[in-house]
Amino acid sequence: MKALKSVAAILLVAGISLSSSAETILGFDGEETATVGIYIKDLQEDKVIAEHNALTGITPASTMKALTAATALSVLGPDYRFSTHVNLRGSRQGASWQGDLVVNSVADPTLESEYFDKNLGFCDSVVSHLRAMGIKSITGRVVVAESLKDAGPVPQWEIEDVAWSYGAALYGANWRDNVFRLWPATGRTKPHVPGLKVELHRDADGTELLRGAGSSTLEVWGRDINNAKWSVMSTMPNPAMVLSHELTERLRGAGISVNGDKSASSQKQETETVYVHHSPAASTILKSLLVRSDNMMAEGMLRAIAPGDDRKDAVKREKELWDARGISLKYNGIIDGSGLSMGNKLAPRTLGYVLEWMARSPYGELYPSLFPRAGVNGNMKS
């Protein structure tokens, strides 16, 4: 009963987006230049209470995450976890490993995320396990292996979004939410971002950031660019490099030498497991990303439903899932899992059907509990 009421409340919020219209339905400023789509259904009475532009494809923005979460929960289940394996590759000679330390990434969007305190300490765990194995030196490098297809910013995202923290993209290896803090006047970053180039510009209008997809050059505009206390948050161009550098430095600081020899090898190639890191459960990740409207994590959960495939295949599987449930997404445009692309289109009634299906499913209590509460928390607190 409680779950059904909760989902009905979500339906109203999910159908609002901007475009053009001469009508005013909700009475907010600027509504005459907006398209408002509404679909409200009383699930207990099985009766549609109100609908307006319910079949119109509207840019959903972050309400796309409601569909992504429903899909991920259905395919993966609430207890699914990403597992990142750390291995030694090469051969052992006493306390020395002749070869590399390899982090086999699985596009876990939560690795060392600040939003999951209980799962922090990845580097420390690797260090402690190597010590327990008696390894004191590694002749090769810390290699971060990535396998995610079409990683990085979604091509249809606006270039102006890429450098800002909300525009953090999903990669094969993700680290610290794929963001960093930069002090432009000094060039210092936290964490250290290898290969980053910063170009500063003075601008009286305020702070602006710009970085092209795949570029390691970040352009920063600001009023007082010489202020050493001024800092900005931006996105990592290559999270795998940041992870590799940080883990290498942590190992060296703990007394485990990493020689960094790219040609380090041995005739006998072996693999030994050092550590397996598990992410939070899918339900925990989904709740966090929905409450905060985290774009990168939404992309990670969408891609998780089709491991080894590209983004289009993940979207195809999502459409097939709902089509099998009698809800066609054929004429709804789905480009990403976060809703950051302006090319996404969802009809309010279609999203309403998805939410209704979830309310009547075995996840009828869990699914609504993942969303932020208006006036209480997350991006709906005020």
Q: Where on the chain are the PLM-derived regions?
A:
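Beta-lactamase-like hydrolase cores
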Residues: 18-59, 63, 76-83, 120, ...
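Conserved serine DD-peptidase/penicillin-binding transpeptidase domain
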Residues: 24-27, 75-330
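Small-residue-rich helix-loop
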Residues: 49-51, 302-382
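Positively charged n-region of N-terminal signal peptides that target proteins for export
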Residues: 1-6
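Short, structural beta-strand-to-alpha-helix junction motif
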Residues: 63, 281-282, 347
